[in-house]
Amino acid sequence: LCLLAQWSVAQAPKWVDKAKRAVFSVVTYDQDNKILNTGNGFFVTEDGVALSDYTLFKGAQRAVVMSSDGAQMPVEAIMGADDMYDVVKFRVGISGKKVTALTLAAVAPAAGADVYLLPYSTQKDRSFTAGKVKEADKISGNYSYYTLDMRLKDKMVSCPLMTVDGQVFGLAQKSSGQDTATICYAIDANFAMSQNISALSYGD
């Protein structure tokens, strides 16, 4: 049974085009201004609050994001992070009045629900990866940690996972062990959004 409607265009939900504009590429630099890491993230507010994986930012002196239309914007401050679940919330110095942002899902998808992963792309394509929620475990209060029937490629870590109605519920995370061909994981986007530390800017 193939659950991978990989890069299928036919069934792309109508919200995909707009939602993909919220996904960006992240580049972090070390103190010698050499590239440290590259990855993905996405906006969750129109004024530039975004989510990604904390691993990307470890040891970084500065970071920039590259939007789907090629605009480069600086990361201004880390707003919160969780090392164990590898999430980070940060503010981007946006270049316009506002950016396209994803709406956080109010209701967590249940086991068996169809879900979509939106990759970062500079092309105007409607590519996505379809999968299903295998299970959802509760973590730290009312948040969820998801196991998904979905194959994850390396460059998809921290891409947004969407419900069928186009709301973001999770950040894609690396799978490890034998199940990597069929299974991946996701941390609750609302958990990432709840992270708060006293504002640290990269200049500090």
Question: Across the structure, where does each feature detected by a protein language model lie?
Answer:
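Bacterial N-terminal signal peptides
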Residues: 1-6
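A conserved glycine-rich beta-strand in the N-terminal activation segment of trypsin-fold
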Residues: 11-12, 28-47, 53, 71-74, ...
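C-terminal cap/linker of serine protease catalytic domains
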Residues: 11-17, 60, 97-99, 168-204
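Gly/Ser-enriched beta-turn/beta-hairpin loop segments
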Residues: 17-18, 32, 79-85, 133-146
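Terminal peptide-recognition signature
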Residues: 24-26, 41, 48, 52, ...
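Residue-level recognition of beta-strand microenvironments
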Residues: 44, 78-81, 136, 164, ...
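Conserved active-site neighborhood of the chymotrypsin/trypsin-like protease fold
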Residues: 45-127, 142-145, 155
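Catalytic nucleophile loop of clan PA
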Residues: 152-172
